[in-house]
C-alpha cells in the first residue's frame, strides 16, 4: 500500500509510545536422644537465623510464596522483593513497562554493591544469526569480530552481551536489535547505558573510552549530522548500527515508538511507503530502523529530539571506505610519536592498559594528532563495514568482495596489534594472519 493524499490517518508512533512516568514445612519429630537433641538445636539455630534475616530485610515479604520455594530462601537469594517478582514486568517488546525509573532505582538501592560505585556502567550488546554463515569465510570473520569486541571490553571495563537468538522472529534483520536491547535493559538494571554495536563493526581504537559526561543531558547517542537530518532530510543522515541508549523510562518509551514502525505493526507496509516518500534518497520501499529513527526526529512536536545526541566530533561509528585505506598511515604517525616518548615504549602488564592509554592520549594532544575524523590522525574509534555483509556475503552491489574482505582484515589486524603489543607480538603485515615478536623498545628510532 502506497501513501497517497487520501491515505488513512495514522497515529504517530511517538504518541503511542509516550507514557506518563509513574509512578516450610517442619520435619517429623525426632525420637529423644543426644542425636535428636543436637538435630533440634541445629534446626532451631537455622530457624532463628532465617527469622533474623527476614526481620532485618527492608522489603515486605507479605506476598504469596512461590511454589516449592520458601520465602526465606527467596530473601537470601534476591535480597527481598524487586520488580523481578512482578509478573507484569516483561522482557518482550510487546509488553510496555511503566515506572521503570522507580523500579530500577529501588533495585539499585537493594544492591549497592552493583550500583557502579559512582561510575556509569556500560553494557555492550551485539549479536549475529544462530545458523551458520552463508559466506565461506563468514563464520571465521564473525569469530574475529567477536574477539575484537571482547578485547575492547576487557581492556576498558565494559561488560559484553553477545546474542545469537532471535528474540522476536517477526522482527528480523535490522529490527532484531530492538528486542535484544529492550531485554538487556531489564536484565541489567546495574547498567546506566546499553551500547549496541553491529556485528560488522570493528573497535579500532583500544585506548578510546566513551565520553559519557558529554551525554549527561541526553538519553540516545548516534553518529549523525543535524543539518543532514533537519535540512537535507536524508535517511543516511545518521547510522543506526551503533548507538548508545540510557537505561531509563524515556528509552523504553522511545523503543516502543521506534518498534511501532517495524514489522510487528499492522501498518508496516504503509510506513514503508511513508518513509520512501519522505526521504528522496531512499531507494527501497520498506520501513527500516534507520529511516524510522530519522523520521521520528523530523516530526514537529517530537518528544524525542531534545534527548537525542547526534555525535560527529569523532568516529563514534565511521564509514569503512573512508577509513580502511588510511590505517597504515595512522600506524606510522603513532609510531613516530612514540619514538620521541620513551615512557610510552616501556613494556607493561595488560592490566595497566588504562594508564598507558591516558598517557598516549596526552602525547597525541602534544603532538597535534588528537583530532579525529577524515582530516585527523587519531585512530578511528569504530570502523563500521556497513553494506559488506561478511556473514551472508550479500554485500552492497557498489562494493567488491575484495574491498570488503581486505578492509575488514586490515581493520581487525590494526586493532589486534594494539592488543598483541602487551604480549610482545604484532601481525607480520596488515593482511597477514601470522605474527612476529616485537623487538625490545619498539618502536625505536632507526638510523
UniProtKB/Swiss-Prot annotation:
Q: Annotated Gene Ontology MF terms?
A: galactosyltransferase activity
Annotated region Disordered: the residues are: 1-31
Membrane-protein topology: Single-pass type II membrane protein
Q: Where are the transmembrane segments?
A: 38-60
Basic residues compositional bias, start-end: 8-23
Give its E.C. classification number: 2.4.-.-
Cytoplasmic side of the membrane: what ranges? 1-37
Where is the protein found, in the record's own terms?
Golgi apparatus membrane
Q: Which domain of life is it from?
A: Eukaryota
Under InterPro entries, the record lists: Glyco_trans_34, Nucleotide-diphossugar_trans
Q: Which GO terms describe its cellular component?
A: endosome; Golgi membrane; trans-Golgi network
Keywords annotated in UniProt: Glycoprotein, Glycosyltransferase, Golgi apparatus, Membrane, Signal-anchor, Transferase, Transmembrane, Transmembrane helix
Which Pfam families does the UniProt record give?
Answer: Glyco_transf_34
On whether Transmembrane helix is a keyword of this UniProt record, the answer is: yes
Residues the record marks as carrying a glycan: 285, 329
Sequence ranges on the Lumenal membrane side:
61-447
Annotated family = Belongs to the glycosyltransferase 34 family.
Function in brief? Probable glycosyltransferase that may be involved in the biosynthesis of xyloglucan.
Q: Would you tell me the protein name for this molecule?
A: Probable glycosyltransferase 7
Organism of provenance: Oryza sativa subsp. indica
